[in-house]
Amino acid sequence: YAIDKDIKLFDRIREVFNSKLIVLDKDDIKPSNVKPIFIVGMPRSGTSLVHQIIGSHNKVYGAGELNQLNQFVVPFLKNYDPIKGFIKEDLLKVRNQYLQYIDSLNVNEKIVIDKMPLNFRHIGFMISAFPEAKIIHMNRDPMATCWSIYKYYFNGNGYSYDQNDLANYYHLYKKLLAFWRQLFPNKIFDLYYEDLTNDQEKQTQNLLKYCELEWDENCLKFYQNETAVRTTSALQVKQKIYKGSSDVWKKYEDYLQPL
């Protein structure tokens, strides 16, 4: 793993959105059959748990971790021309490709969750291309997050195998989130994993209110939801919420100095 590649990617993302800020409005888009809810954050930050909670609502379909947004955005980033800049047609292309894929899922629900954690890189595209979307960013204690990533060795995430790489990537992530918050104030719903585990009902109420969903008791019984979960967190989200998981790393503190 070489972090230089990710540094260049994150720099390119900031370059695109620093050049000219464009956001689609209602006059630019056709009415969509579905409204996306994007759940993002670092892996092991609680995205699967929130997916399972909201996905237990009777009006919501939990689609899991979809790679489509990344597939549609990355070619644009690679071919970005600073002279031409960033235009509405670029956003419309990403929007239409993504919504066509969501339509192809053929689900009855009008609200669809996409919980690809690393889509935090594309929050700018979410806000700009999907003005109707809801964006939930999961926060968790940094050491708890990084220890959990390191413990489970995420396939495909090269930074997870080395503590120094992991720490450096985490700093890239935090820097980009600060950029998004400054660029799009009040557009991202920040949820803290520790708050959710300490007061599930209150935080679930806040979540549903943000998503413009009425209360559904099923969201408190998310562990009974039979929807398949295909992540490392699959077993955990089939159980009731438990407290204290963010402190487990402390038992290994002496071995986690690079973090």
Residue ranges, per PLM feature:
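Phosphate-binding active sites in nucleotide-utilizing proteins
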Residues: 19, 26-130, 134, 138-139
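Short hydrophobic/aromatic residue motifs in ordered secondary structure
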Residues: 15, 49-50, 144
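A secondary-structure boundary/capping signal
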Residues: 65, 192-193
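Acidic, metal-coordinating catalytic cores used for nucleic-acid/nucleotide bond scission
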Residues: 117-119, 195-199
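Conserved P-loop NTPase nucleotide-binding/switch module
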Residues: 126-130, 136-160
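Conserved nucleotide-binding/hydrolysis micro-motifs of P-loop NTPases
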Residues: 67-69, 140-145, 196-198
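PAPS-dependent sulfotransferases, especially Golgi type II membrane carbohydrate sulfotransferases
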Residues: 1-36, 82-110, 149-190, 198-259
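Short N-terminal helix/helix-N-cap motif within the alpha/beta-hydrolase-1
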Residues: 121-124, 147, 201
